[in-house]
Amino acid sequence: STAEVQLAAQSTIPNRDFVLDFRVAGDTVKSNLMTYEDPQSGQGYFTMMLYPPTGHESFARQPMEMVFVLDCSGSMNGQPLTQAKNAVSVALDHLQEGDTFQIIRFSENSTQLGARPLPATKENIRIARKYLARLHGTGGTQMIEGIKAALDFPHDESRLRFVSFMTDGYIGNELEIIGAVHDRIGAARIFSFGVGSSVNRYLLERMAKEGRGAVAYLGPQDSGEDIMANFFGRISHPALTDLEINWGGMAVSDVYPAKIPDMFVGRAVVVTGKYLGGANDVSVSGYRGADRHEMTVNAADDSNKAQVSRIWARLRIADLADRQAWQQDPHGELENSIRATALEYQLMSDYTSFVAVDTSQQTDGEYGVT
């Protein structure tokens, strides 16, 4: 079935991205594979979308290894740190038998609750709350120490490892932090929680994206209980993890994102790329607990959907910008690629913009107007 969506107010100026919120019917993963071939060049483009169901009731809960990393620097002192500690305390209530957890604090250095993740027993949770109560904000922000402490210890492969950073993100070495996440992420997922009224969104969003996670914000008036309940509801019942795509005979290239994220309730997975020589159905597989599930995504030829190529271009630009964040760009090669892609596909970017040119003619006469 199809639906047509348009702006209700015809006079609305479309000067920003259009966002459509919708719910997926049913309790199974839905999929769509749009393809388009440029009639001049023959270059093919595709966009594949995987939609999880609205609720997580049909997915079994997975054992988790939760690592809470708290920024205890001076900029977090007061209400932000209190909110972060309360959010972690609420999160501890959502742990179940079979889960493990760790708490790491950092400022100018890092310390942690235990030498290794602890089983989520009542006694260990009581000890964790006493540890939280003693934390206070002071000193500088050496987030790199928190990154190393959270990602360097061995991973228990029987559990999904989620690393939750609670921070305002105010540091001076953003590129080093993002590079460290890229180099050390392994099988972990990073979820960034921006705490306070003014946070470093650039850093938090880049960390979450590089860590195949997501970002959330905990403002002064927000409820840590609601945010953590929503967070645990999603991550403890993943629709599919460790996704892999079998392209069959489809000759694909330049596929984005380079790291395919897990599929959680409330977050679709979008993969786009180029192809040559025709499109075909593809197979997507991933883990749901210990079991591997596979599904077929049918290709649909949308010959009148030239915007599929622009979706590819937008995700390519986003990928190049992410690489700039951790790889840096001393010779400007990534910048040039972003600019060239944006110009070819007529898109806004950090290096291109739209310019309105008035083509109207001035009338004759001394008092002519345009």
What are the roles of these predicted feature ranges?
Residues 55-57, 75-77, 110-113, 171-173, ...:
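Flexible loop/turn segments at secondary-structure boundaries
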Residues 61-79, 86-89, 93-99, 104-170, ...:
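Short, charged loop segments at secondary-structure junctions
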Residues 116, 228-231, 362-366:
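Short secondary-structure transition/capping segments
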